[in-house]
């Protein structure tokens, strides 16, 4: 019994069922879930069951029906976990279930109404109430908020919420997220404001099953650091980390298609509302979101199955970002609570059965939580050291006095401000050099202004300021001084006043920084009435006792049922044969019912295995087709030398288990200088494909040439000289000669432009000569010879 209680403290699995919705009642769906709160059992009836098929029964640490309240779930199940986090343990609370079953309602609830607040706002109130009632302890509370959207980690509190963050792993601290923002909060109002800011940028969408469906897994991380002085007189620091996880749901896409025609997920407007889930539609981002959500939840199921089996040596934490972030919460250093949310309607039988089996497997996980005491990288220790250093500087500046001295010669010396000053102001202090009368050796200069307990900094600065003002007024009233000397003394006094003001400003900045750092540390027992604290504390103790009593009662009833079964088997004395027959018949029927239930469970597991195998085969075939397509593109369209360059740049990132490209410019090398454009490997001015090289070598179309696109066949021989002979008719009739010239000119001008461009070679390049029958030509016909040559061609 004790071992069972100890194991239940490390990991608790509870089930919660919502009531039937109006939409389900209008559609005529019946309720198939029965919740036995006293025994912690859930009974699921198959609406399509064959005659004689028994309902399936599952037992959990606690069960909450439709009439349960938010406070019941928190006080009985979650409150002990938050107390453990305040003691230095790691804790995780996550809700798992079908979309629309109330995951987000369970985790967040309705913030406006106190009775409807979920786990997260109640945890806020619990943490800061505990801090205000504690004594002699210092606390530092930090908050971070992230989401996993399509296997990408996003910081919901960043100014760039769409920026992708990297997941890293440290051998000492474990898995962490690089550059994740964290905010120090001092009260409930501040941490609620942080969460509301994150909810405004969280991805949500509308589906048929839920109008406000979460499209991502959201994790709100609270880190509580506590410093307490131990019996050895040393301060010991405990660090507790609380992960509040709101998972997106998994279901069939044909049930939860989007209400609109696709589209990407939109940011949420705040907390509250129904549970999240994945939907699928014909278009938009819904199918992608659903596939990524189902992939991560499938990886979570594989991790839980591997941890529950106790046979597998490999736990597939690296299959998704979600399982890597929950690595400590599942089988590691954490106390975990899983809330399985269920839908009671008959149309959700398959999803409810899958959720119940998932939760039933999770019961067998064994966590090993331990207190995180005195870690090296605590922010609280850094704050304490910084506050102590600032306090020492303030004491050094605030307790000032004068030291009695003998003869001294004054000189000015620039003294740098102590470390921690903003912008490092330089303060000029008067330094005295004391003379040793015995050996005339100068001692090292020491400042006149030293620590003294009789005056604080403010009084000293005020006195010095008044003294300088008096000296300044005395110099102005002294008529024996020359004007130049008076001006010089006044300038020195002004400079001393300016130095004094600078020192006062630096001290005020230092004091403000000290107060700001100290205000971030929450010290218990302040500003709360002791009598009210005692009453509230007693009330909470009574609530915890009642919740513990209910838990023990439930465990005792479960134990009694097991004992009754054992005693029935041990009974062997009967008063008559009829009684023996009745008892054994009853036992036989009970065993037969168990046998049928086991057979049905085996058949369901077999069907589930076949379905999962078919899904895996389909995914494998799809990946194989995509891989073949990429290989085909690489072999036919990418040159081998380019392929080799790409292959040489590839490397395996062991942290993310992904292949990545090495940067073209190595890390640490400045790329500010302009680099020369790389030349082609074959000597051309620009890269040329293999096909173009072959075509260019064969002398085909000029489109494949990189240079010398036009080849002109030049004829270097001298032009042919023709003898001009004029006919007798043309000499006598110049009008006919002129008309013939005009007709040839018109025929040349009427040629199409393409012909003129194509035949625009000079007459000396023409390969043909004029016909020998032409024995006469005029000067005009000689000028029109290109047209004649074109006609012959």
From Swiss-Prot:
Keyword vocabulary terms for this entry: ATP-binding, Coiled coil, Cytoplasm, Cytoskeleton, Microtubule, Motor protein, Nucleotide-binding
Gene Ontology molecular function: any one: microtubule motor activity
Subcellular location: Cytoplasm, Cytoskeleton
Spans annotated as Disordered: 251-288, 394-424, 750-793
Primary localization: cytoplasm
Positions with biased composition (Basic residues): 399-414
Coiled coil: 376-629
Biased composition (Low complexity): 256-268
All residue ranges annotated as the Kinesin motor domain in the record: 10-365
Biased composition (Gly residues): 269-284
GO biological process, one term: microtubule-based movement
Sequence positions that bind ATP: 97-104
GO CC aspect terms: ciliary tip; cilium; cytoplasm; cytosol; kinesin complex; microtubule
One protein family per Pfam: Kinesin
InterPro entries: Kinesin-like_fam, Kinesin_motor_CS, Kinesin_motor_dom, Kinesin_motor_dom_sf, P-loop_NTPase
Chain positions covered by the region annotation Globular: 630-793
SMART domains cross-referenced by the UniProt entry: KISc
Assembly behavior: Heterodimer of KIF3A and KIF3C.
Family as reported in the entry's similarity comment: Belongs to the TRAFAC class myosin-kinesin ATPase superfamily. Kinesin family. Kinesin II subfamily.
Name this polypeptide is given: Kinesin-like protein KIF3C
Lineage: Eukaryota, Metazoa, Chordata, Craniata, Vertebrata
Name of the gene this protein is made from: KIF3C
């Amino acid at each position: 019994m004790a071992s069972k209680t100890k194991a239940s403290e490390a990991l608790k699995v509870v089930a919660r069922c919502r009531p039937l919705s109006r939409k389900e009642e209008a559609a005529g769906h019946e309720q198939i879930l029965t919740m036995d709160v006293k025994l912690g059992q859930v009974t699921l009836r198959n609406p399509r069951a064959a005659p004689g098929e028994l309902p399936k029964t599952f037992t959990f640490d606690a069960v909450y029906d439709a009439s349960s309240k938010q406070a019941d779930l928190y006080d009985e199940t979650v409150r002990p976990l938050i107390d453990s986090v305040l003691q230095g343990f790691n804790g995780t609370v996550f809700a798992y279930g079908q979309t629309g079953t109330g995951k987000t309602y369970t985790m967040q609830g309705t913030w406006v109404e106190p009775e409807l607040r979920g786990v997260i706002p109640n945890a806020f109130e619990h943490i800061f109430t505990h801090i205000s009632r504690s004594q002699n302890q210092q606390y530092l509370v930090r908050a971070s908020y992230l989401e996993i959207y399509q296997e990408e980690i996003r910081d919901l509190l960043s100014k760039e919420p769409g920026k992708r963050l990297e997941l890293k792993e440290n051998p000492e601290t474990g898995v962490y997220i690089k550059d994740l923002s964290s905010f120090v909060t001092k009260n409930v109002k501040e941490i609620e404001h942080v969460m509301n800011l994150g909810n405004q940028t969280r991805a949500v969408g509308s589906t048929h099953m839920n109008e406000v469906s979460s499209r991502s897994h959201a994790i709100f991380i609270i880190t509580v650091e506590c410093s307490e002085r131990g019996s050895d007189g040393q301060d010991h620091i405990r660090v507790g980390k609380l992960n509040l996880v709101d998972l997106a749901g998994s279901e069939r896409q044909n049930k939860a298609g989007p209400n609109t025609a696709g589209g990407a997920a939109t940011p949420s407007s705040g907390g509250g509302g129904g549970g999240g889930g994945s939907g699928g539609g014909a278009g938009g981002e819904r199918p992608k979101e659903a596939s990524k959500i189902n992939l991560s939840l499938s990886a979570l199921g594989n991790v839980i199955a591997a941890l529950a089996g106790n046979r597998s040596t490999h736990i597939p934490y690296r299959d998704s970002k979600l399982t890597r972030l929950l690595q400590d919460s599942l089988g590691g250093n954490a106390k975990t609570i899983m809330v399985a949310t269920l839908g009671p309607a008959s149309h959700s039988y398959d999803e409810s059965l899958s959720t119940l089996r998932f939760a039933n497997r999770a019961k067998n996980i064994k966590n090993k939580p331990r207190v995180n005491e005195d870690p090296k990288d605590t922010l609280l220790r850094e704050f304490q050291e910084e506050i102590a250093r600032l306090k020492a500087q303030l004491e050094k500046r605030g307790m000032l006095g004068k030291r009695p001295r003998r003869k001294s010669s004054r000189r000015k010396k620039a003294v740098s401000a102590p470390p921690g000053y903003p912008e490092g102001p330089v303060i000029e202090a008067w330094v005295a050099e004391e003379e040793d009368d015995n050996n005339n050796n100068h001692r090292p200069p020491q400042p006149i202004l030293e620590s003294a307990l009789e005056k604080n900094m403010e009084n000293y600065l005020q006195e010095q300021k008044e003294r300088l003002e008096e000296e300044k007024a005395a110099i102005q009233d002294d008529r024996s001084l020359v004007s130049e000397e008076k001006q010089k003394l006044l300038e020195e006094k002004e400079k001393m006043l300016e130095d004094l003001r600078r020192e006062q400003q630096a001290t005020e900045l230092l004091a403000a920084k000290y107060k700001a750092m100290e205000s971030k540390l929450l010290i218990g027992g302040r500003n709360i009435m002791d009598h009210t604290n005692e009453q509230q504390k007693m009330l909470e103790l009574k609530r915890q006792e009642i919740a513990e009593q209910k838990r023990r009662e439930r465990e005792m009833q479960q134990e009694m049922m097991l004992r009754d079964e054992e005693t029935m088997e041990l009974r062997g004395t009967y008063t008559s044969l009829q009684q023996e027959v009745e008892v054994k018949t009853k036992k036989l029927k009970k065993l037969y019912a168990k046998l049928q239930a086991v057979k049905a469970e085996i058949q369901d597991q077999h069907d589930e295995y076949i379905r999962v195998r078919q899904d895996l085969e389909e995914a494998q075939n799809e990946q194989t087709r995509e891989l073949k397509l990429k290989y085909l593109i690489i072999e036919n369209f990418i040159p081998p030398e380019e392929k080799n360059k790409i292959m040489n740049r590839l490397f395996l990132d062991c942290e993310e288990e992904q292949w990545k490209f090495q940067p073209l410019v190595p890390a640490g090398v400045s790329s500010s200088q302009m680099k020369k454009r790389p030349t082609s490997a074959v000597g051309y001015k620009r890269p040329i494909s293999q096909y173009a090289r072959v075509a260019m070598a064969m002398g085909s179309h000029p489109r494949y040439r990189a240079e010398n696109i036009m080849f002109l066949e030049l004829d270097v021989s001298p032009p042919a000289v023709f003898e001009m002979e004029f006919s007798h008719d043309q000499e006598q009739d110049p009008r006919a000669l002129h008309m013939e010239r005009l007709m040839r000119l018109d025929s040349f001008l009427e040629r199409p432009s393409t012909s003129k461009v194509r035949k625009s070679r000079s007459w000396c390049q023409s390969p043909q000569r004029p016909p020998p029958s032409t024995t006469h030509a005029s000067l005009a016909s000689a000028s029109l010879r290109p047209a004649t040559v074109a006609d012959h061609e």
